[in-house]
């Protein structure tokens, strides 16, 4: 049986206990839940390999192994599997009730734009707001951010063409999903996830996932996706919008 290693937690020596009846391995592991506590957590197919993707703040993952500062995980949001530095994860649990709708929001130590900054969170990050004071929201175990940068986690029906314009001039980063660097399929995934639509990570997965094929170019509509080898773009009105510069 052939599995896609990008989304299947099976290695030569170890596998998720969920696959015990399917594959034979030396060791089977019951996953432990963790949450990303950094602005993003890079994910690699192997330690030292090129970047595969990134998990954003607040996203949950299943941890199958933690060793020498690395964790072998599977994202619960898109099922991607890989190695990430353990320092980016926490076993603390959250109940996300909001998400970041702006390209980037700054985190402050107090509800004051003149306050000390602690970092940032990117579009599509998931947060638990525990208090609102004036124009600011307090994110659990993190700090304050402008409330205008957040929407309720169940909010949807956003125009992803308009949202994609926030990324204009964002650097291209292979495997990126963060606002500091992103690739084409990462952007498309973020735009669908912000509308609470499950969406796979890579272009080949996305092309299979999108079932309605447009036969003629004249039939393309705003918001349609166009695929070619290794790339994806979205149609903006009558023009093709390339998400990032490669």
Region locations from a protein language model:
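Boundary regions of SH3-family modules and the immediately adjacent low-complexity/disordered segments
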Residues: 1-28, 75-101, 140-163
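Beta-loop motif signature
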Residues: 23, 35-57, 101-129
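Single conserved hydrophobic/aromatic residue that forms the stacking wall/gate
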Residues: 239-246
């Amino acid at each position: 049986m052939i599995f896609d290693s990008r989304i299947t937690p099976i290695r030569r020596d170890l596998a998720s206990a969920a696959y015990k009846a399917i594959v034979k391995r030396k060791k089977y592991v019951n996953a432990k839940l963790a949450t990303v506590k950094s602005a993003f957590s890079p994910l690699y197919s192997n330690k030292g390999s090129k970047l595969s993707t990134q998990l954003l703040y607040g996203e949950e993952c299943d941890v199958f192994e933690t060793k020498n500062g690395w964790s072998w995980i599977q994202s619960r949001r898109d099922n991607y599997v890989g190695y990430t530095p353990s320092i980016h994860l926490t076993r603390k649990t959250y109940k996300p009730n909001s998400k970041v709708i702006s390209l980037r929001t700054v985190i402050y130590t107090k509800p004051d734009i003149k306050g000390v900054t602690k970092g940032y969170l990117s579009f599509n990050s998931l947060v638990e707001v525990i208090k609102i004071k004036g124009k600011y929201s307090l994110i659990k175990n993190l700090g304050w951010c402008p409330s205008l940068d957040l929407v309720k986690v169940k909010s949807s029906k956003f125009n992803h063409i308009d949202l994609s314009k926030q990324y204009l001039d964002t650097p291209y980063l292979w495997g990126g999903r963060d606002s500091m660097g992103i690739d084409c399929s990462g952007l498309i995934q973020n735009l669908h996830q912000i509308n609470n639509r499950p969406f796979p990570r890579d272009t080949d997965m996305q092309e299979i996932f999108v079932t309605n094929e447009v036969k003629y170019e004249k039939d393309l509509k705003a918001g349609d996706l166009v695929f070619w080898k290794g790339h994806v773009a979205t149609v903006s009105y009558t023009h093709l919008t390339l998400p990032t510069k490669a």
